[in-house]
C-alpha cells in the first residue's frame, strides 16, 4: 500500500 514517496509499500519496494 503506497502512502508517501518516502514510504515502503506492501511489496517492500520504495515507492
UniProtKB/Swiss-Prot annotation:
Q: What else is known?
A: On the 2D-gel the determined pI of this unknown protein is: 6.1, its MW is: 45.3 kDa.
Q: Can you say what this protein is called? A: Unknown protein from spot 445 of 2D-PAGE of etiolated coleoptile
Q: Which organism is it from?
A: Zea mays (Maize)
